[in-house]
């Protein structure tokens, strides 16, 4: 894909395709090709014969094999060609081996009869080298079908790659997941367990030292072997066993030496920390049982309505607590080994074998998501510490704004200077705005004069870049009447946001766009999908699915990372951290995504509105990681492309050591005999087998697409017919694009080499057309799932239902950082959007309460998903419960009868358990008490405001069909630090918590006044009511502080609402008249006394 192709705009349905070039763009550069042959056994060049001709080992099929491997195969191997199985004939210059045909030529006697000094050092070295090598090349050959690849005669454990700096005696399998990358395979020696071990033949006349036994080298090797076994044993013990869901091991991949050690490690929470936590949860459950038994069996006759409401609310809170608490039963942490990843896949001086990654950045409105913020995110991606040819950045502009397009063009030019500067000095973070804002002494570790000089120059360059971006923003404030035009006078295709063609522009790429030092830059692609009236575009989920298809056509990396436009890469090695899980041979096969926690910049020190969400990211997510993995939170997540395509997770193979070891031998024989009988009955002739691709439907009635086994021996006509049927099925699922459908079958990624750039561009425009997803499974079973504004929950839920597991990765340095809303109104609107999405899922077909049973979803993982969609409903009992204290104080009644000693014991035990649970959670997770308390406060604030409105809006949408649109949270900020913190924006979300505050304040005043008026005996019952009211007020305190703001900026609307509500409750207070003394004596009418 060429970077200089220009902006490509078009519509597949209208058969339009236009290429708009920018002024001064050079033409496309020719692409260089190499035509050298590589040995398919060892990976070296095939080489030439002494006559200068290419060396050909097999005259039948000309399979590429070098001379050394040819001689070794004839001398020590099968003597057959790995491809056509024809016996190798002796070539001129090669030694004769048993079985060769008789030859009359005598021009090569020396080599024919192998007259060579066996003690020659070169000969010995070659023999030792060949003794540790075997044949097989992992990658598919260019132009050769997969089923024609060489098949070794001994079973191989796996495919792999050799680490060249490891001594030959330590060579081991190094798995690789790269397709077409030239993988070398070094299999373990295969030994049939049914045969006796063959002793090594030795000449009695020779000293044992000649064989290595008893020598110093032999002793050193033995000591080295023992140390390795000890390290492996220790590593296994440190691993902490298996995951709760049984993942983590693969019987086909035994651990061997350092080159085969895992790339990551699971670290369970210490039992001294987590066991008391589990015990207090069980105790709290028991106490809750006794507590509810007392509450239900002891109603309050004179306040039955208040008692009934309170009991219902408390039961709901208990159920909500169970759903939230038990998914945290198995908390774990993880550790990665980047040095092992580098040793295995990214060795210095060699071509990197790390898997390619496609980066997705989504933006909608450049006025609410400033282009400078998006530019910093893109720059941090382009400068990431990852091989350049493995990185591709796709920016989705769902608003089709020319401002975003021009800002991205400026960003690509500035990247040519910024990227080499970051990599030369290993800067962190690599987003220039945040790097230059760091309040650190940058001269502390960088004392080189060149760095100081270049840093100052780069800062000037960045300030000029900001001026250009801000000038574009200022220019975009006033839209011309005729619409925007490009530099060459062409009208901007996206002038009509709701009706425009699809647009693609490659700014940087392999064939164009090098930095100032002449080095290649990662690919940068601008994408704006087609939009037409009458089509449902599914908001962000639809945009992400369009990026999935475009990237599959152009680059098709096996892994994808999605980021919001305001989340930049704070740790340049974050992608390698994710690859430690994805490319790990032990745990990587079943991992669908690696989720990183969200961290934020620009939040005030006290985190008044719980923007950091520390409790969720550092407690809940760690607990889920011990079950089936964390839920997807919408950004900062590395996906496996195949998992997004709706494929089922690979099934785990049960190790042989775990089967039938505890059964008698006669039982094993019976089982084995029964299996053989069944196999004989179900066996089919080879002629009936055919290569096929089938789809299977899971028990949960959700289609899952899994590749079936590929068998050989099918006749050509039947095979072709089956292929046509399978192609039709795939197009029905994935859409009418043959290029994209073909890419979905490449598990390790890669693009079609036969396709031209022009055809790829045309296909890319096709897959982002507005009608491409019609009558397909996009948004239903494939990609980001539609049906909710919180598409992230549904997407992760579907993958977990297919049996995949996810991983939670918390690097020491935060992987990504973003911006969070600082003022109260924006924060409440953000929470409203999340809660509304949960309500939409609750009423959808994908509700975790009834969807996905019989699939791969774990029970406790389901608890977590159920909690994520029912939590907004807690707002109704929470609002009622927060109103009860004021009603009790105003009416003089209470929700419980007079407490006995036993009742007091249950109440005190419950309070102690609640506090103990929180303390022990903070203890094992490392969360501070400030963060924990802020989370508790905002749970009440959000519950009585945003969550409550989300419930009513969701009901309106389901019952009346009234759809509520959400607004994008503003990412811009004032120049003054924390200036947005005190900005007040009126919204109806503020009415319920404001009313609760005033109501409880009036109730407290009324209760105290009533107690003063009635004497000392009324103070006892008052304490319980006052504690209840102050519990509500303390939880709403951050809301009160945000509502009032600065003393000189108290908004008028707050004063008006306060006076209005205070007047209403004052009238109610006068009606109650608490200062009037109450006569508790007998009624005169009843006693019969006439006081007149």
Curated annotation (Swiss-Prot):
The chain crosses the membrane at residues 280-300, 303-323, 869-889, 902-922, 939-959, 988-1008, 1020-1040, 1050-1070. It comes from the Eukaryota. Keywords: Cell membrane, Cell wall biogenesis/degradation, Cellulose biosynthesis, Coiled coil, Glycosyltransferase, Manganese, Membrane, Metal-binding, Transferase, Transmembrane, Transmembrane helix, Zinc, Zinc-finger. Binds 2 Zn(2+) ions per subunit. GO terms for cellular component: plasma membrane. Mn(2+) binds at residues 540, 564. It is found in: Cell membrane. Zn(2+) 1 binds at residues 39, 42, 66, 69. PANTHER family: X-BOX TRANSCRIPTION FACTOR-RELATED (PTHR13301). This is Probable cellulose synthase A catalytic subunit 5 [UDP-forming]. It comes from Oryza sativa subsp. japonica (Rice).
């Amino acid at each position: 894909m060429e970077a200089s192709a220009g902006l490509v705009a078009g519509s597949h349905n209208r058969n339009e395709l236009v290429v708009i070039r920018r002024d001064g763009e050079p033409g496309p550069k020719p692409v260089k090709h190499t035509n050298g042959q590589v040995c398919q056994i060892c990976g070296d060049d095939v080489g030439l014969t002494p006559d200068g001709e290419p060396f050909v080992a097999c005259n039948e099929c000309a399979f590429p094999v070098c001379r050394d491997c040819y001689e070794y195969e004839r001398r020590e191997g099968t003597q057959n060609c790995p491809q056509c199985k024809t016996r190798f004939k002796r070539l001129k210059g090669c030694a004769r081996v048993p079985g060769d045909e008789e030859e009359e030529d005598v021009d090569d006697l020396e080599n024919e009869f192998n007259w060579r000094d066996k003690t020659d050092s070169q000969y010995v070295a070659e023999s030792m080298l060949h003794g540790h090598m075997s044949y097989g090349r992992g990658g598919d050959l260019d132009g050769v079908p997969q089923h024609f690849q060489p098949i070794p005669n001994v079973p191989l454990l796996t495919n792999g790659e050799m680490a060249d700096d490891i001594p030959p005696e330590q060579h081991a399998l190094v798995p690789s997941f790269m397709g077409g990358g030239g993988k070398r395979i070094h299999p373990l020696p295969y030994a049939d367990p049914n045969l006796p071990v063959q002793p090594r033949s030795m000449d009695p006349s020779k000293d044992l030292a000649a064989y290595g036994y008893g020598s110093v080298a032999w002793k050193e090797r033995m000591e080295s072997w023992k140390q390795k076994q000890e390290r492996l044993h220790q590593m296994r013990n440190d691993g902490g066993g298996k995951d709760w869901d049984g993942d983590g091991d693969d019987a086909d991949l035994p651990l061997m030496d350092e080159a085969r050690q895992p790339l990551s490690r699971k670290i369970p929470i210490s039992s001294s920390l987590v066991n008391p936590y589990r015990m207090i949860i069980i105790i709290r459950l028991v106490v809750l049982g006794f507590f509810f038994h007392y509450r239900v069996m002891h109603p309050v006759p004179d306040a039955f309505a208040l008692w009934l409401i309170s009991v219902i609310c408390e039961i709901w809170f208990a159920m909500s607590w169970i759903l939230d608490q038990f998914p945290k039963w198995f908390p774990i942490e993880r550790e990665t080994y980047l040095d092992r990843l580098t040793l295995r896949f990214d060795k210095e001086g060699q071509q990197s074998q790390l898997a390619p990654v496609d980066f997705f950045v989504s933006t909608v409105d450049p006025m609410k998501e400033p282009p400078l913020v998006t530019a910093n995110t893109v720059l941090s991606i382009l400068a990431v510490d990852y091989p350049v040819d493995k990185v591709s950045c796709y920016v989705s502009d769902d608003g089709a704004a020319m401002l975003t397009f021009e800002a991205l063009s400026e960003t690509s030019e500035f990247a040519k200077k910024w990227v080499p500067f970051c990599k030369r000095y290993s800067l962190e973070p690599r987003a220039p705005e945040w790097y230059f804002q760091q309040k650190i002494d940058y001269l502390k570790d960088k004392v080189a004069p060149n760095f100081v000089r270049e840093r100052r120059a780069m800062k000037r360059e960045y300030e000029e870049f900001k001026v250009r971006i801000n000038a574009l923003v200022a220019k975009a404030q006033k839209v011309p009447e005729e619409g925007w035009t490009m530099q060459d006078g062409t009208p901007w295709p996206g002038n009509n946001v709701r009706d425009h063609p699809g647009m693609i522009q490659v700014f940087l790429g392999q064939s164009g766009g090098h930095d100032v030092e002449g080095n290649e830059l990662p690919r940068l692609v601008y994408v704006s999908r087609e939009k037409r009236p009458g089509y449902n575009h599914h908001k962000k989920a639809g945009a992400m699915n369009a990026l999935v298809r475009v990237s599959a056509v152009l680059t098709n990396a096996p892994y994808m990372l999605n980021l919001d436009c305001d989340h930049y890469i704070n740790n340049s090695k974050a992608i390698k951290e994710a690859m430690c899980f994805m490319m790990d041979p032990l745990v990587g096969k079943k991992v669908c995504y690696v989720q990183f926690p969200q961290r934020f910049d620009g939040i005030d020190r006290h985190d008044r509105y719980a923007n950091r969400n520390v409790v969720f990211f550092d407690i809940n997510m760690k607990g889920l990681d011990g079950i089936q993995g964390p839920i997807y939170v919408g950004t900062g997540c590395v996906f496996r492309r195949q998992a997004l395509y709706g494929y089922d997770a690979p099934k785990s193979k049960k190790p042989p050591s775990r089967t039938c070891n505890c059964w008698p031998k006669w039982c094993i024989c019976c089982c084995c005999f029964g299996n053989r009988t069944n196999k004989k009955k179900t066996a089919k002739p080879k002629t009936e087998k055919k290569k096929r691709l089938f789809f299977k439907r899971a028990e949960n009635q959700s289609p899952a697409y899994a590749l079936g086994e590929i068998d050989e021996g099918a006749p050509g006509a039947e095979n072709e017919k089956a292929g046509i049927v399978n192609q039709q099925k795939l197009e029905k699922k994935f859409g009418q694009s043959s290029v994209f459908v073909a890419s979905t079958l490449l598990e390790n990624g890669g693009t079609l080499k036969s396709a031209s750039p022009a055809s790829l561009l045309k296909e890319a425009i096709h897959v982002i057309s507005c009608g491409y997803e019609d009558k397909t499974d996009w948004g239903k079973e494939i990609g980001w799932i539609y049906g909710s504004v919180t598409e992230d929950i549904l997407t992760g839920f579907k993958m977990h239902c297919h049996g995949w597991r996810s991983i939670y990765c918390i690097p020491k340095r935060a992987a990504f950082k973003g911006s969070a809303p600082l003022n109260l109104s924006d924060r409440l609107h953000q929470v409203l959007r999340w809660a509304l999405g949960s309500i939409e899922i609750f009423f959808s077909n994908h509700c975790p309460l009834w969807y996905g049973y019989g699939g791969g979803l774990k029970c406790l993982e389901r608890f977590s998903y159920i909690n994520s969609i029912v939590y907004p409903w807690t707002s109704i009992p929470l609002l009622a419960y927060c109103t009860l204290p004021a009603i009790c104080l105003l009416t003089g009644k209470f929700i419980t009868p007079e407490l006995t000693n036993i009742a007091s014991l249950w109440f005190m035990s419950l309070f102690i358990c609640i506090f103990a649970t929180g303390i022990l959670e903070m203890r094992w997770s490392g969360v501070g008490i400030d963060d924990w308390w802020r989370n508790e406060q905002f749970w009440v604030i959000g519950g009585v405001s945003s969550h409550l409105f989300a419930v009513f809006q969701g009901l309106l949408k389901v019952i009346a069909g009234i759809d509520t649109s959400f607004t994008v949270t503003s990412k811009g900020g004032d120049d003054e630090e924390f200036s947005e913190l005190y900005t007040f924006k009126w919204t109806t979300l503020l009415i319920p918590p404001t009313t609760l505050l005033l109501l409880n304040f009036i109730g407290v005043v009324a209760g105290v006044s009533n107690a003063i008026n009635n004497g000392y005996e009324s103070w006892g019952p008052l304490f319980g009511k006052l504690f209840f009211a102050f519990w509500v007020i303390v939880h709403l305190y951050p809301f009160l502080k945000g509502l009032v703001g600065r003393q000189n900026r108290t908004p008028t609307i707050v004063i008006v609402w306060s006076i209005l509500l205070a007047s209403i409750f004052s009238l109610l207070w006068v009606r109650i008249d608490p200062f009037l003394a109450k006569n508790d004596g007998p009624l005169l009418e009843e006693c019969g006394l006439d006081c007149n």
